Amino acid sequence: EYSYDGQWIYFNSHRTGRMHVYRMKPDGTKQEQLTFDAFDNWFPHPSPDNRTVAFISYLEDQKGQHPFGREVKLRLLDTQTKKITDLTPVFYGGQGSFNVHSWSPDGKKLAFVKYTRFN
């Protein structure tokens, strides 16, 4: 997904053996890994001010997949410090929870889908 200022494209890649968040310039240069933790991180969406990137993290190893019906959490990455903050506690979600652009125009809210468990 493009940053609002058009300077970066944010994406996820499994190139290290675990899914992580990256960014690169629109011409493909300056590729930079942004997450380095033990989670599989998916669906990065930069904020309107380009200061943070929201994404979901799977708590169990999904081996490059992003299924629905798993334990995930919504997290924020500070693009300057690279610090990651948990925005939500663990919830039941995954594929379909946070796939599309989800920031409000003023950057103060995020929309996401939380599933109900049926046993």
PLM features: what roles do these ranges have?
Residues E1-N119:
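Sequence signature of WD/YWTD-type beta-propeller architectures
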